[in-house]
UniProtKB/Swiss-Prot annotation:
Span of the signal peptide: none
Gene name per UniProt: Radx
Protein name per Swiss-Prot or TrEMBL: RPA-related protein RADX
Purpose: Single-stranded DNA-binding protein recruited to replication forks to maintain genome stability. Prevents fork collapse by antagonizing the accumulation of RAD51 at forks to ensure the proper balance of fork remodeling and protection without interfering with the capacity of cells to complete homologous recombination of double-strand breaks.
DNA-binding region: 228-331
Primary residence: nucleus
Biased composition (Basic and acidic residues): 590-608
Keywords annotated in UniProt: Chromosome, DNA-binding
Subcellular location(s) of the protein: Chromosome
PANTHER family in the record: RPA-RELATED PROTEIN RADX
Region (Disordered): 1-31, 575-612, 632-671
Single GO cellular component term: nuclear speck
Organism encoding this protein: Mus musculus (Mouse)
GO MF term set: single-stranded DNA binding
Length: 850
């Protein structure tokens, strides 16, 4: 365990004077991993670069030889205040990037001006990268430690084959626990949030141990409450853990705490329940070993007045006294707290320690639960959404991680809908998938009965704990009557029912109210409406997996239906080049090379665009490739990606000749309507004179919910988790995401919305939730409920138990959009940054003026 002193730490020489690692035969093995066997020797590119720069710290060196390296790790930590950076407002966090040249690995420091490459998940593990400008830095808190700093980088594609078992050039990088290159911190943070324990400082080795209670004086919590102000020494406490909070990281650049963590335990004896706080280095030492239900003996603690703004969770037992005037503080030092886990077999009945009580409810009981009630649930996972993120505060670098899940328990046709935030249990949060047992405690009810459709879901609280298959054995709730019934019901589930489980994709929840006036009650006035011209800026500011909901005004001028069989295709994302010079476009390569240098502002070209902006251009497509895009695998028309600027569209036709010939004309508004598309006369008049046309109508494979297949559970789970901080070799040759069946058989629609001033237009995607195999899974979330258009989601299932044919439904949606010709509408858009310059913009709801 690392201490908290600020003394310089010993480290190896920056020169890394070790023998070069011999080159080995690069023989690929299953899983896309290269194992190496000693044979020949070759010079390490990393070694040559280090030797070139170590004599000139802080001076950028442009490398004459640039070779591809592999990214093996991207790790985040708090950057402390030090006279180090020329950046006027340095970011709160910085990143160490571990690379391999096939001979050595090296941990490098990413210049903070390139942090956005990580924010956008462009620089990530498993990609090929070319570094062409570097510098050398020294960590003045450690002896002789030299650091390779990345100042100019070209990020390429993910690699199918990754070399492993290459040693670190600098052996200090292999030491445990891992330490960041800069500053005095002893640990890394989780890559995408601060709540999850990450790295090898987090111990799990604490076990119950027999304890000799002779000569131990124990005080009750109620007695301590009455006397703590007049005591200097406190007798031991014997308590049971009833609740455990998620971790709180309170690190700041100007704070010198080595491990600035805090967590709360709610503990109780026969006289009441009180809060216990674990501080700083005690959290990595104990957090992962302390679980709800354990009995603890606490000695050498301190007591202080309770923090007035914190709200304690209520005891599950209404007869238990809640002690809210004091808090118990546990520290690694001053004084060093003594914590002992007492085995259950050593407990005595006369101690009268409270039992762990759960508040399980069934799904049928949830309908009657009041707002903000606290409950526990148990059931079977039927849907597991992707991991998403939301900012804790505006302009903050800190995010919450969460995902939506469905839990069924057999008592209702409806599932529990749960917004599952990270509970500092990454081993659970990142490894849940459909058709597994799932328990979640301390959930809060969120409801609004006046909204249509009614809003009802559960969300985690600060004390929520999650358990999945394999984590239940021996826990008290397995004897709970409700839990036992649900467990028996789960055992009756069949493989046929498993086929209806779903994982990942865009999930339009929570639903917005039926009127815009109700929607506006929950939005700040200054951020209620976003102009279409501002949408691009909103998208540029989003970080990886960050989701945001906005409202825009406009006129629906066109809609195009794209069937499922053509909706999952995705072109590879572009390679990105961050350079010391201004942005330039490589016409020869046919891909957009984005350039960036240390300390410069992020260029316009570096920002995430709609997938259609960069996927294909006529300059790089062969005739054969063009035909494939135009025809698709079944020779049916599919949309051709358009340039980002409307100026480049002038002179081109919106429809192909074959599409024009099949178009049916209607009278009155000169609209063109077929079963799969419509465009208004207004669009015909304005589309070639637009100032800008934003193309975000493409649907990436990640946006499509997939039918879950147990044999591919690891692959599917990884696809819809956040990008890992360290490279994980795949098992065998992994499949592609778009090979998995969509849970939305209807496909999607591309909707064009023209701004009210007829100067800017935006294409967005509309993905109706439609499943003919499972009527109950089709949610009432229509294209336009204010039109009383309900054929997509009939209020009651047809006698056949199946929904209408997808083509018929699609035709009705197209006609419904056509009925809005020249009508001013308000569109609610859900926007999510999918990483690697891919963005998802989905139409969630349409309002017409009230």
């Amino acid at each position: 365990m690392s201490g908290e002193s600020g003394q310089p730490q010993p480290g190896p020489s920056h020169a890394g004077l070790y023998l070069e690692h011999p080159e080995r035969d690069q023989a690929g093995v299953p899983g896309g991993v290269i194992r190496r066997a000693d044979s020949q020797r070759r010079r390490s590119w990393i070694q040559k670069v280090i030797e070139q720069i170590t004599g000139s710290p802080r001076q950028c060196v442009t490398l004459s030889e640039v070779v591809p390296v592999t990214v093996l790790a991207v790790q985040r930590y708090l950057l402390e205040d030090e006279p180090r950076d020329t950046v006027p407002k340095p970011p709160l966090y910085c990143y160490d990037v571990t690379i391999s040249d096939g001979v050595y690995q090296e941990k490098c420091y990413l210049d903070p001006s390139l942090n956005f490459l990580v924010y956008q998940n462009i620089l990530k593990v498993g990609i090929e990268m070319r570094i062409s400008r570097v510098s050398c830095l020294y960590n003045e808190k450690r002896l002789g430690q030299g650091i390779l700093c990345i100042d100019k980088v070209h990020c390429g594609e993910s690699l199918d084959v990754i070399s492993v078992e290459t040693p670190f050039r600098n052996r200090a990088h292999e030491e445990k626990p891992e330490r960041p290159l800069r500053g005095g911190k002893s640990h890394y943070l989780a890559l995408w949030n601060n709540e999850d324990p990450y790295g090898d400082i987090w111990k799990t080795n604490k076990q119950p141990e027999e304890f000799n209670f002779n000569n131990i004086k124990i005080i009750s919590l109620s007695h301590l409450e009455l006397t703590w102000n007049s005591r200097k020494n406190f007798p031991a406490l014997l308590v049971r853990v009833l609740h455990k909070s998620k971790l709180r990281y309170y690190g700041k650049p100007n704070k010198k705490m080595i491990e600035p963590y805090q967590t709360y335990l709610e503990v109780a004896d026969s006289s009441g329940m009180v809060s216990v706080i674990l501080w700083n280095a005690l959290c990595p030492e104990w957090y992962k070993s302390l679980r709800v239900g354990l009995v603890l003996l606490l000695q050498d603690y301190t007591v202080k007045k309770s923090y007035p703004l914190r709200i304690q969770p209520d005891p599950a037992d209404p007869q238990m006294k809640l002690i809210s005037t004091m808090e118990i503080c546990l520290n690694l030092r001053d004084p060093p707290t003594n914590i002992v886990i007492i085995p259950e077999k050593q407990l005595k009945s006369e101690w009268k320690l409270p039992k762990l009580i759960n508040r399980f409810i069934t799904r049928s009981e949830l309908d009657d639960m009041p707002e903000k009630s606290i409950c526990d649930v148990i059931g079977l996972l039927s849907f597991v959404g992707r991991v998403q993120r939301s900012k804790k505060k505006e302009n903050s670098e800190d995010f919450w991680s969460y995902r939506w899940i469905h839990i069924t328990d057999g008592t209702s046709e409806q599932p529990f809908i749960v917004q599952l935030f990270s509970t500092s249990q990454p081993e659970v949060f990142e490894n849940i998938y459909p058709m597994t047992y799932f328990v979640c405690t301390q959930l809060k009810v969120v409801r609004n009965n006046s909204q249509v459709p009614k809003l009802l879901y559960l969300t985690t609280t600060n004390e929520s704990r999650a358990l999945t298959t394999g984590g239940h054995r021996g826990l008290p709730y397995t004897y709970d009557t409700k839990a036992k019934k649900i467990i028996q019901w789960i055992k009756t589930k069949t493989n046929l029912e498993a086929k209806n489980t779903v994982i990942g994709g865009y999930y339009p929840y929570p639903p917005v109210p039926e009127t815009f006036s109700k929607y506006s009650r929950f939005i700040k006035a200054e951020s209620l409406l976003t102009t279409i011209s501002e949408v691009k800026k909103v998208i540029e500011d989003l970080q990886y997996r960050e989701q945001k909901r906005i409202a825009i005004q406009g006129i629906i001028t066109a809609i195009k239906y794209i069937p499922y069989k053509h909706s999952a295709g995705s072109a590879p994302a572009p390679e990105a080049f961050w350079n010391a010079s201004r942005p330039s476009t490589s016409q020869a390569a046919g891909k957009e090379d984005h350039c960036h240098e240390r300390g410069s502002k992020r260029s316009q070209d570096d920002r995430p665009m709609g997938s259609q902006h960069f996927q294909y251009t006529s300059k790089v497509l062969s005739l054969c490739a063009k035909r494939k895009i135009l025809q698709g695998p079944s020779a049916n028309p599919v949309p051709v990606p358009q340039p980002h600027s409307s100026a480049q569209m002038k002179g081109s036709k919106h429809n192909t000749p074959s599409q024009e010939s099949s178009t049916a004309y209607t009278t009155g508004k000169s609209r063109r309507i077929t079963n799969d598309r419509w465009e208004s006369q207004l669009w015909q008049d304005k589309k070639f004179s637009l100032r800008d046309h934003l193309h975000y109508g493409h649907v990436d494979p990640e946006s499509i919910p997939r039918k879950f297949i147990l044999e591919h559970e690891k692959f599917l789970t990884q696809q819809f988790n956040s990008q890992p901080a360290k490279y994980i070799p795949p098992e065998g040759k992994p499949p592609k995401l778009d090979e998995f069946q969509s849970a939305r058989s209807l496909g999607h629609f591309e909707v064009t919305i023209l701004g009210l001033n007829h100067e800017i237009a935006i294409d967005v995607a509309f993905l109706p939730m439609y499943s003919p195999e499972d009527v109950q899974a089709s949610q009432i979330d229509t294209f336009l409920t204010c039109m009383n258009f309900s054929c997509v989601y009939p209020p009651a299932a047809p006698l056949s138990g199946r929904l209408p044919d997808p083509k018929a439904v699609a035709g009705d949606i197209v006609k419904a959009a056509a009925d809005l010709d020249r009508v001013h509408i308000i569109g609610i858009l859900d926007i999510c940054n999918l990483g690697n310059n891919k963005v998802e913009v989905c139409l969630q709801k349409i309002y017409t003026p009230e």
